[in-house]
């Protein structure tokens, strides 16, 4: 895998308006004088036994669920942790912090064709190596991996929580690497590798300066955006590359007919097909799918042969698409205000 060459310039301890501040104030305004920030809970996980726990899930389970409002910072030391990770809905404000995404790896190898206790295949949605059900989850410098390989659907991560953030992380898989099932998510300086539909789901998500690595002929996105949801996936200032060189991929295909996916200022190698988008043999999506680009560059970025049912945005239209507008929701969440 290609190394992430430019880690984000700030770490969680400094970048999130201080973790406790973020908890008390998601908009990241200053805390009023006289009000103290809550103290975070710090836990160290180390595979070599030098921390409080040797596996991540044990550290997660050590913190009681309930109405706790102080953030939990789990420092994961370098190592490969082969385990299923589950952050339950009641465990809000969890932060997984590694030291280097290439050295701190959370991995498992379930896939959809494995037989369950009833003798039937377990299916896509029971395969995530990591599952995030809780709101206000953050990860930094971590690799999330499904190591099953080219055997069918095999999720590296499933996110159902709202206001999740991932900084300088890697997501490694083959088919269905990342499922963003609901809520809002923000990815910055991340590396995402896969083959077929490897970023999919109904959530609203912003990807900033991410490297998308295509592992063969396939599809990058498969959004299932609800009709009444203004945005699905937005990629801004990203880079798309591929291996092997002769492979070709689509930017997306609609898992549901109102799929919404936008690429802004994204560099696209020749792996991106000239037509750009695929309709999944659903011609009705030509009227309903919301696919758009602005200023795509590189050999795969030319608009000349794009399908006529996808849109090329004007400069003004693109400028209006910001993290605050896309992710704001009812609470005004804006990760850029951290």
Regions found by a protein language model. Name each.
Residues 1-8:
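N-terminal secretory signal peptides that target proteins for export/translocation
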Residues 9-11, 28, 66:
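Intrinsically disordered, low-complexity segments enriched in proline/serine/threonine
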Residues 11-26:
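Bacterial N-terminal signal peptides
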């Amino acid at each position: 895998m290609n190394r992430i060459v430019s880690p984000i310039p700030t770490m969680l301890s400094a970048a999130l308006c201080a973790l406790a501040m973020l908890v008390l104030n998601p908009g990241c305004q200053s805390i009023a004088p006289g009000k103290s920030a809550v103290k975070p809970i710090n836990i160290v996980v180390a595979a070599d036994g030098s921390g409080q726990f040797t596996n991540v899930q044990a550290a997660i389970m050590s913190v009681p669920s309930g109405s706790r409002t102080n953030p939990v910072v789990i420092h994961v030391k370098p190592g490969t942790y082969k385990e299923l990770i589950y952050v339950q809905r009641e465990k809000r404000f969890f932060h997984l912090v590694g030291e280097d995404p290439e050295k701190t790896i959370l991995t498992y190898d379930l896939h959809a064709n494995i037989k369950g206790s009833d003798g039937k295949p377990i299916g896509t949605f029971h395969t995530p190596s990591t599952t995030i059900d809780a709101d206000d989850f953050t990860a930094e410098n971590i690799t999330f991996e499904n190591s099953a390989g080219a055997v069918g659907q095999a999720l590296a991560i499933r996110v159902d929580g709202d206001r999740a953030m991932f900084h300088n992380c890697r997501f490694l898989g083959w088919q269905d690497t990342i499922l963003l099932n609901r809520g809002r998510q923000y990815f910055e300086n991340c590396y995402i590798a896969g083959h077929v539909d490897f970023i999919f789901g109904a959530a609203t998500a912003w990807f900033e300066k991410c490297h998308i690595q295509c592992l063969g002929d396939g599809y990058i996105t498969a959004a299932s955006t609800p009709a009444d949801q203004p945005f699905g996936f937005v990629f801004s200032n990203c880079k798309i590359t591929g291996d092997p060189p002769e492979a070709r991929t689509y930017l997306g295909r609609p898992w549901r007919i109102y799929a919404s996916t936008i690429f802004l200022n994204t560099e696209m190698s020749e792996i991106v097909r000239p037509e750009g988008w695929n309709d999944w043999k659903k011609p009705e999506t030509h009227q309903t799918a919301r696919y758009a680009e602005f200023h795509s560059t590189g050999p795969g970025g030319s608009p000349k042969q794009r399908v006529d049912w996808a849109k090329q945005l004007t400069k003004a239209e693109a400028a209006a698409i910001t993290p605050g507008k896309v992710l704001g929701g009812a609470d005004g969440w804006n990760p850029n205000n951290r």
